[in-house]
């Protein structure tokens, strides 16, 4: 059976073998992985059960590999990857903002460390854990969840929120260092005329959506008090606040280069072996360079109405790559019919199918009635040399065909 409307939901609390055989598993286990990494026994058991299935079924396509997801959940690791990619690509149009980890309270040596890492005021502080709204906001009393979310899912989300009880912050002076709460990642703030470009990648295609962002601030030390904010709210399509209100456009103001976005997306996909991810890009208003400020595992794809179609297309491609002798897709067939044909050609048992363990966002495709601008929808070609992939991403798992 192949389900394209909602997907079969995989229950990790039951033996996975009894729920297969499985051709493709699409998951969003970020909350569970975070809990497991924080020594939650039940979450560790669930992740291990899933990993055991992957190890014993290398033929199953995993979207996306767990080690790569762990990299994206850790801003230090993902920022280091961005830095190394910048060095590899050697493209003057691309830059990675300087950053450093702050593992303890600011002390006498903090200023020296900032200078060592080429960080200047103002800079932005973010939680080291990077995952959806949880890594951007302080939990509030009205964080309800839809009825469709499982009880286990609700518990995990609430636990994560309770542990991430601070907002992002912009620090303008040495006096403001007292507002920095470890563990966090400090990243240079780059003026970008209050425009954020969210790149949503699905396999070999991507869509760029324009969103509001933080306004420009004077460079260097100032007597401004630290600003605390919820970046998820700031970058919402309908966002309107003093933080995003730009008095005047300064310096360079232009949309991102399609060639640069394609290059960044392609190299990230090859380095990590992932298919479903988002990239936050800003344009430095002084140099015109493209700066990658965050990478997200399996984002919400808001503003990408054709997400589900692109996902099905990508599944078709990975199934075809795994079984080149399968019939080629017919131009007159629908996406579900084509993928079903592949599955049938592989002699899939009746219980075989595409399975999702995703949270509420995973299969959600919303229209975009907001003011966000959809700029580009393009396809990638992947040619990152294997030696670089091995250098930056030994975490790629054999369970994925990417």
What are these model-predicted stretches?
Residues 7-9, 64, 278:
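A structural preference for short, hydrophobic beta-strand core positions in alpha/beta folds
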Residues 27, 125, 187, 279, ...:
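Active-site flanking residues adjacent to catalytic metal/cofactor-binding acidic residues
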Residues 21-25:
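Conserved acidic residues
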Residues 19, 29-33, 43-240, 247-250, ...:
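Active-site nucleotide/adenylate-binding loops and adjacent lid/helix of ATP-dependent enzymes
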Residues 3-20:
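A short, well-structured beta->alpha microelement
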